[in-house]
From Swiss-Prot:
Protein name listed in UniProt: Uncharacterized protein in nifH2 3'region
InterPro entries named in the record: FAD/NAD-bd_sf
Disulphide connectivity of cysteines: none
Pfam families on file: NAD_binding_8
Originating species: Methanothermococcus thermolithotrophicus
Alphabetical list of SUPFAM superfamilies matching this protein: FAD/NAD(P)-binding domain (SSF51905)
């Protein structure tokens, strides 16, 4: 069966992978860049995270089943420290909701 998946973000790509493994002919359509909001860009020599790059504390559900059954997922950890650059200054990455709000 020919199937079109609209959206090349995490969910779209995993869905397309699962459908292809089941023998379907899959076409993924993405209006921007593959990966959706889960990607990095190089801007003026800096690697900038565009969106989500970590999914933590996953409970058993559709996403974990797709990852476990169809993806050869090997975590890639990079040492960047606990800071990010904001207005030419290093800012500590907040670890709680209250810290994000201030």
């Amino acid at each position: 069966m020919k199937i079109v998946v609209v959206g090349g973000g995490t969910s779209g790509l995993l869905s397309a992978l699962a459908l292809e493994k089941e023998g379907h002919d899959v076409l993924v359509l993405e209006k921007d860049k593959v990966g959706g909001l889960c990607r990095s860009e190089n801007i003026d020599g800096y690697t900038v995270d565009i969106g989500v790059h970590a999914i933590t504390m996953l409970n058993d559900g559709p996403l974990t089943r797709l990852l476990n059954n169809y993806a050869r997922y090997i975590p890639n950890f990079r040492e960047y420290g606990d800071y990010y650059v904001r207005t030419d200054k290093l800012q500590k990455i907040p670890v709680s909701m209250n810290e994000w709000m201030t």
